[in-house]
Amino acid sequence: WYTVDGIFTRKSSSSRPRHLTNDDLSNHYTRGVSYKEIFPNKELGTNDNTTLPVLNLAFYPNERGPYNLDAENVNSDGTLGNPEKRWGGVMRKIEPSDLESANYEYIEFWLLDPYLEDETAEGGDLYFNLGEISEDILKDERKFFENGMPVDGDMSKVDTTVWGKVPRTQSTGYAFDAQNRELQDVGLNGLSTEEEQIFPTYADYLNKLRAKLSGETISKMMDDPFSPFNDPAGDNYHYFRGDDYDAKELDILSRYKRYNGTEGNSQESDQRYATAGKSTPDVEDINGDNTLNETEKYFEYKISLRPKDLQVGVNNIVDERTPEVTLMNGDKEKVKWYLFKIPIKDYEKRVCLLYTSPSPRD
């Protein structure tokens, strides 16, 4: 989940990698989207940005995500088995928290046709959960916050869980030690990549994974800095720019695959530009109230993203637009946008779950 940076959407950008052509910049899922494309009657001032900040959600169901230690359902080439059973999700704080009192009535958004490049795709489902969602991302009933990791090497200040290390201290705020940021910016498991290599949970995962893979796959993975053998937890961060990315001539989508990593996402840069994804520690405290919420109590809304269900009048779709857009390569193409408007009162399911603490392989 990300917003594509302007260096990839502005035609005049001097920072764009040279190998990216105008054809690359014309991909509908990474190109810039103008206000007029969706809101043709919107009046813009002379100093207004004419490009919409689009939320991009990319899901690769046959590729491993952070802290996924499933070594059983893996193919010999390293891809995940049963991709149709995989899921991906994001969560964030919503303000105000009391939507009813604030008179919010709908979940409303425009969605670009997901099947512009593959009309034969079967599609899937998109869920929205509004309410209390557990902040315990790595299920251990302990709140992790990166700035709680000791910088003096005193391991009496941490406890060990099945996932890694967690601070024993209570959090009073979230800010890195100014002089030792690299010792704390280790991701939500409290372990650096080097520590993951020898930590029992990840070492066991790697042993089981190695037995499932072909020799050719293992050889390729050893050369991949983001493979499980070089990043056991799968939590390492990489900015969407980098000399290594340029050398590999990565496309725009591939450049954002590691952008949500939590280990190393606040480091100072040795590049000629800033590369940090954020300046604050990663924490299991989405709403910033200094507590760990473990409750699952929410309203669930479901929409189908199957091609046959993308039509006005059903599936909470209330409008559609088919503008003709001029792409960076000069081509003109028609694309379709769907307007979803989901009444908050019309939830599909009300969920209230008791907390359980599964193993990292569940």
Go through each PLM region and give its residues.
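Short glycine/proline/serine/threonine-rich loop/turn segments at secondary-structure transition edges
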Residues: 349-354
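Long, low-complexity, polar/charged, intrinsically disordered or flexibly structured peripheral segments
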Residues: 1-84, 175-339
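Outer-membrane beta-barrel and related beta-rich outer-membrane complex signature
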Residues: 138-144
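Extracellular/lumenal carbohydrate-interaction signature centered on repeated Trp-anchored short motifs
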Residues: 96-103, 331-334
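Extended, low-complexity, turn-rich repeat/linker tracts enriched in Gly/Pro/Ser/Thr and Asp/Glu
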Residues: 114-120
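Conserved small/polar residues in nucleotide/adenosyl-binding loops
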Residues: 355-362
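Short edge-strand/loop segments of extracellular domains
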Residues: 130-138
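Extended extracellular/luminal ectodomain segments enriched in beta-structured repeat modules
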Residues: 101-106, 121-123
